[in-house]
């Protein structure tokens, strides 16, 4: 598998892959592919970098990340559907760790709790649970609605 830094010319393809990622992980994001392309252009023109992984001339995965002073935040890692469970994700992470990212920074990634395969994958490559984000959706706290409370132990 080869890899290269993504450029702005890659944004249309990255947007298509990002759209697949959103659908596959069950995210609520409703952005269209053109909107995702514009967002990707903005990210790559700013503080994000992307790496594209190819095999036999085919794009098989990509990673999108932002390097900060003390950490590297991996926003997205996506392997195309027909190439999953073939070691590509693990190889992509290994390339990031061994050839792209400095070894002196904390590495973070966020995963949707409902995406069990992704949670298992990240744990299998060395990431450990750190935080859990909880939310209340607008419909859940509309006027006149009382939030459900879980009884606490005495």
Give, region by region, the residue ranges found by the protein language model.
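A short beta-loop-alpha structural element at the N-terminal edge
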Residues: 2-16
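Conserved GNAT-fold acetyl-CoA-binding loop/helix
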Residues: 16-40
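A short helix-loop-beta-strand connector motif used in the catalytic cores of GNAT acetyltransferases and
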Residues: 41-52
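Conserved beta-strand in the GNAT
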Residues: 52, 58-66, 73, 78
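A conserved beta-turn-beta hairpin within the catalytic core of GNAT-like acetyltransferases
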Residues: 67-75, 84, 103-105, 130
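Conserved acetyl-CoA-binding loop-helix of GNAT-fold acetyltransferases
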Residues: 79, 85-98, 120, 124
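Conserved active-site alpha-helix within GNAT-family acetyltransferase domains
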Residues: 90, 113-131, 136
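Conserved GNAT acetyl-CoA-binding A-motif
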Residues: 100-112
């Amino acid at each position: 598998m080869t890899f290269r830094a993504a450029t702005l010319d890659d944004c249309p393809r990255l947007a298509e892959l990002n759209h697949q990622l959103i659908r596959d992980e069950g995210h609520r994001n409703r952005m269209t592919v053109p909107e995702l392309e514009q967002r990707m252009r903005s990210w790559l023109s700013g503080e994000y970098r992307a790496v594209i992984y190819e095999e036999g001339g085919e794009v098989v995965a990509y990673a999108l990340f932002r390097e900060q002073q003390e950490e590297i935040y991996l926003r997205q890692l996506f392997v195309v559907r027909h190439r999953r469970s073939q070691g590509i994700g693990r190889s992509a992470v290994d390339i990031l760790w061994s050839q792209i990212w400095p070894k002196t920074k904390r590495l973070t990634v966020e995963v949707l709790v409902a995406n069990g395969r992704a949670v298992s994958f990240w744990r299998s490559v060395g990431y450990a649970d750190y935080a859990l984000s909880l939310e209340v959706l607008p419909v859940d706290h509309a006027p006149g609605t009382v939030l459900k409370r879980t009884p606490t132990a005495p």
